[in-house]
């Protein structure tokens, strides 16, 4: 009976170590599922318009959350400084659904998302997602 317990615990240990080793060997990634509403980003005539979305890989979210839209959009390298690991740009048309696979640096702790809406003052243009490094997830 003791041999069965030892074998069982050895098996569990090896399975857990295998999962940990896989995280060390395979680069982390995240699937970002971004869906633009059909009426997104209306122009002055109320017609939907495309929107540009930036995805930032960050080591910390502090600087990202303290900056205004134009500072991040126009001077992201300057204002985010050492927190910025990488940046992706995605352009979405009204009604479009985009699944983007981001291969992330092991240093990435957060994803900062900025949408360049026409009416920034009345928009929810910023989103921050804490990266789960223990698994590979889809963020919507």
Language model regions located:
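Exposed aromatic-hydrophobic patches
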Residues: 97-104
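Short coil-to-beta strand junction motifs in C2/discoidin
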Residues: 45-54
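Short acidic/polar inter-strand loop motif in beta-rich domains
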Residues: 117-125
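Short amphipathic, basic-aromatic surface patches that mediate peripheral association
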Residues: 33-44
């Amino acid at each position: 009976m003791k041999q069965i317990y030892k074998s069982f615990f050895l098996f569990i240990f090896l399975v857990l170590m295998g999962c940990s080793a896989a995280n060390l060997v395979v680069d982390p990634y995240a699937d970002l599922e971004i869906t633009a509403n059909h009426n997104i980003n209306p122009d002055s005539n109320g017609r939907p318009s495309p929107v540009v979305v930036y995805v930032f890989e960050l080591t910390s979210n502090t600087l990202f959350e303290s900056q205004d839209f134009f500072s991040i959009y126009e001077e992201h390298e300057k204002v985010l400084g050492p927190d910025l690991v990488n940046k992706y740009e995605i352009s979405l048309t009204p009604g479009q659904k985009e699944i983007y696979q981001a291969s992330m640096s092991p240093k990435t702790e957060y994803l900062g998302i900025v949408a360049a809406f026409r009416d920034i003052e009345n928009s929810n243009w910023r989103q921050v997602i804490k990266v789960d490094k223990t698994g590979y997830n889809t963020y919507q």
